[in-house]
């Protein structure tokens, strides 16, 4: 008999070789119908896999990310099976589950797969899913796998297999389709009830631009048609909120191939928005005793060799810059932490000096594949609101609490009200890959858990998800249309202090390693602005919006009065513009509404005679007339009340 420990701490005994599905059935037949995958000692596996030893065990349903992942991974195989029937001779690349759905990269040979072909492929997928095909996992020798896929002319699969370590590899078969795959998968295609293929795109094989361009088909599936219908409604709303569209309408940022792909340029209004965000965070950080630094945009190759980033991320960096005089190599800065380690090392440190909190709005550059670039959310140059905290092991919890305060202020000020968190801890069993002492890990893990409890933050604990150098806490927010975005991370790091030989003198007069904590409430300025645009549909909080007021003279003869109104409002720190175009007032109102300006002040003969303005509020329409001073005071008070909340 083996002992199975459930998340609530309860333990049950089962026969060796029991499967996850059998365990679910032993609890309830209804549960067995709903589960999609299971977790065994931190590893997500198929429900049909036998369990042969004592294990920590969890069942995953649709509501769990692991459940969705297995569902969409199987859906990718279902797509491939349909393509195999419809396009004989098609070759397959990779087909993973992604955050929202799945894709498969294929080489259809002479055939061309267009978006007009997607409905027919969907229909074939539905036909196959209805057969409730069982997925069969098989472990075979590497040479047998090469032979099997080679006989089918699967050159892409053979390339992947040849790079695997010698030994046994796994395949999954459903119906007539067999794929090279680690899993996990559903037990059958039966749960897949609603299917939608979304787009067709090009993607270079393995992301390398000198390789074959394949056809990438994106899709999403659900266990119920109602879920798909709701998702498609959300997609339509997401198109309206696309930050690329709204950013152009509001004149916030631009891209041009002349400057380079993935290199955003911030226009005056977008720059004003960024500056306000940075000043906002600077004020908060000052309250929490952060010291701001500035580092160069490049670094010597040896810096990144020491940090380990060169070995791990060298391929994601731009080509090195060679200095002919010194014969050295420099890289565009891909991250800020190595520079901050050198700042820490610049002076001797005592335990009394800690914690040391170093912050920087540091611009970094990473070579993202052109096919992965997307507006502001995936770029090649971006600015991180980075901070690195150097502290003693006994200070980790307090530092987490302080950073959580800052992140909470950021989210509340931007009207992100639905916040989730995930604590990523070590694998419960396999701990060889982690750097740092068990004692320090246990202290840090417990500190994160206790910090979440003290703040009343509901956090999901994921074992085995920690980086090799430390546990972390990730924050996910739901936007106005229900999408989840990962914003804000607090990461413990035992690796860089070791690599850079960072030290402080302890109260025992002995040298000790500090604990390093990475944190970024925004993540990056670019991605945060993109998420904020899509969350608010461009209707930013009044204190943040680039232009708070548009003054609209009804004809040219009132332009001078409009300028006087602007000058008066400036006394109240109101950011106003004058729309003095020779256009009808209706056109001006529509255009400024599209620019999401919160207030419009219409001025004509009556307003000029009485020193007044006719007020319109975004989304609410006419608010009547006011004296200029009264409006200025009211607006200043509205902004002040917002800012004083945090």
Swiss-Prot record:
- BP-aspect Gene Ontology terms: threonyl-tRNA aminoacylation
Do the record's keywords include Zinc? yes
- Matches recorded under SMART domains: tRNA_SAD
Q: Which residues bind Zn(2+)?
A: 337, 388, 518
Key word RNA-binding present? yes
| One GO term describing the cellular component | cytoplasm
Q: Origin, by domain of life?
A: Bacteria
How does this chain assemble? Homodimer.
| Family indicated by similarity | Belongs to the class-II aminoacyl-tRNA synthetase family.
This protein is called Threonine--tRNA ligase
